[in-house]
Amino acid sequence: MAILGKAHSVSGVVIDEQTKEPLPGVYVTLINDSAKVLMSSTTNGNGWFSLKDVNVAEAFVGLGYMGYETQKIMVNIDGGDLDLGEIKLSPKSTMLGEVVVSADNVIEKADKYVLIPTLAELNRASETLNLLSEMKVKMPGLQVNEALKRVSVDGGGVVFQVNGKEESLSKVQSLNQHDILRIEYRNTPDIRYADRGVSGVINFIMKPRQEGGTIMVELDEAVTSLRSIATIAGTYYYKKSEWSINYGNTWQKNTKQYSDAQEQYIGRENIIYRNQIGQPSSMRDFSNNVSLGYTYMYDLNTMLAARLSFRAYDGNNRNYNIMEEIIGDAKSRYEKFNPNKSKSHSPTLDLYFRKNFSQTQSLELNAMGTISSGDYSREMHYKYDSGTDFNQINLTNNDSWAAALEALYSLKIGKVDTRYGVNYRRNHAENKYSENGAEFTPDRQTRDNLYFYGDLAGKWNKLGYTFSVGGKYFHNTGLSGSEHYLKFKALGTLNFKIDKHWSANYLYLYSPDMPPLSAMNDDVHTIDDISLQMGNLYIKPSTYQRHRLYVRYNTGNFYATGWGSYSRTDNSLNSVWYYDDNPSSKYYQMFINKTENGNYTDNISTQLDLSYQNLFNHLTLSASVGWDKYNVSDKAEYNSLNKVWASISANAYFGNWTVYANYTVAPRYSLDGRTFCRDIRFDYFGAKYRWKDFSFGARMVNAFTKRGFQQETETPSKVHPISKTFYIKDFANMVELNIVYRISFGKSYQRANRTLQNKGIDTGVNVEY
């Protein structure tokens, strides 16, 4: 191939052959006769692209876009700058129908939204989490809190993927946002992950990478408190291989955390009233996560990936409180000291193989193994004014392991995508318990979990649909006996495109859920001088059903989504309090907290999201308001709660500067068993400045507050009602500095999409009592 003495450019406009509309986000490459990519670009919002500094006389221009036939054009460039004019791409006849629902690069498919980040969105973002915060206006149900580094979909958890491979949030944050080709967003549970309780999937499809690599370093340092978060990531590509390393570190020490509580114990001759007055307490958290990854691609249709990761955690809490107790006419006051420690480490190995047999079928195989070892201590020390003391020390030693195998076959039949999968998982937890120096007593539990599933997604006229079914076989074996269940899951969605502005989406989910191993441990643990905690081997799986409907409206840069949902959990898993009034019982006159099946819990929710992007070309505004009603029915009592919640956020852009804010007007409530929980208030505002390969930022968290981080819970009960408020003053008016450094280097090389997942381990340990 001849080399030009003077560099030229190649440009053009890519349009849809049928509609004649420009296609934004088309991936454009310049390829030599050896199929090596020399340079690449993407079309802008008007479908235009330009390849600059071309110094070869002849080459091929390749164009690729999801849902369209790829195209390769031979070009001769020795005559000077070349304008290819309009280039027409033809939609694939075998692809699912799709509708561009706005001018902002959003494609609504049967089972997901496909979003193409604009150049402005990419330039404004300092990293991937910041990009999601800007683009959430186009992603119904997505919530982002940059200060907490928390992402949720429809109020639930998220599975992150990179080119279809499941990754951690820290890995996603290490991506160079300019290398993101598109984002595939699902705000419905994938049947593959439905047994994990997640509400959505966010998949980042990356541009073909260059031989060479990337390095990213990010530091979050609080200057008004002791809090530090660091991430170091690197990836290197060479020929058919990819090596990656990702290290994350979180260190935090609080010296001003408080826990207030009001409790009643009902059952004895006189009600026991306890008022807990929080005193300055301390907490130290130190966690380290490191992962090493390797990917080998035999060809574009065959690949093998491996990942070895290690997590270590060391936590220490020292809680001090003053207790006021009233029993009849008697009043007492005592000091309560409650230290606890947690230390654990866990290595994990993932292996993954994928083979694409054709454009319509593929096979994925995944094997995972992990082990966990940890030591946990929980102490309770009371010092009464009368001079008497109460001391309790609980120790737990844990050794656990888990292994999983999964196979997934994907097949396209005409215009319908289908998947068929099976997953087998074995989880073994072995815990040894000791109280007050007594000999350790063992507890062993093993759970076998066989999960098989299938789904299909298609489109009929304007109606997109997905239907999924799955079956789960549980077998749980412990020292006290064994239980087994066979349960089925079902998931269905309907997505109807009303017109160019309106669309409606309906979801139905039926999901049985097995309790965690810790809830099925019937060993008795001492909480304090008058109360105990135990699990229940014979609790049954709960059954969760949900109906959700939302209507979406979009015109220009304005987005509005109205939501309504109803869910019910039958045989709900609740922590129920009892008073033992049997004189012959071992636990006579003790209050016992035991895991039981309740009748049901109900949740009715409404929500309205309003957003406007690029107001005056500088400002993005978002607001959400909603109402939740919860009903909890146990065998002996009924409780309910209804609350209104609201939040607002804003991002403003001025050149290389970004100013942002997130504020909770009224916090949302959730339900955990029988406990009503007010969401954590963690508001912030800040600014970022981008300079070359750096981003510098500063933000204030929980500004103009005295308590800072605050969480409230309410547990109604006829035996032991509890009201708690936990807050960390260290996080009040907290100032954080952020630095991101990212650099990429190398030549271009095409990689295949892949999936690699690790679902963690259930240790069976519960120290939250």
Could you describe each region identified by the protein language model?
Residues 83-88, 102, 128-133, 150-151, ...:
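N-terminal periplasmic accessory domains that precede
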Residues 287-314, 338-481, 485-491, 497, ...:
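Face-selective signature of the C-terminal outer-membrane beta-barrel domain
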Residues 132-165:
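Extracytoplasmic beta-strand/coil segments of soluble accessory domains associated
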Residues 33-48:
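Short, acidic Ser/Thr/Gly-rich low-complexity loop/linker segments typical of extracellular
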Residues 131, 165-190:
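Short acidic/polar hinge/loop motifs at secondary-structure boundaries
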Residues 15, 29, 64-68, 82-122, ...:
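Short, acidic, small-residue-rich periplasmic hinge/interaction motif at the N-terminus
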Residues 512-561, 568-570, 590-604, 725-733:
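Outer-membrane beta-barrel signature, preferentially recognizing the C-terminal barrel domain
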Residues 475, 500-545, 566-585, 704-720:
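Surface-exposed extracellular loop regions of Gram-negative outer-membrane beta-barrel proteins
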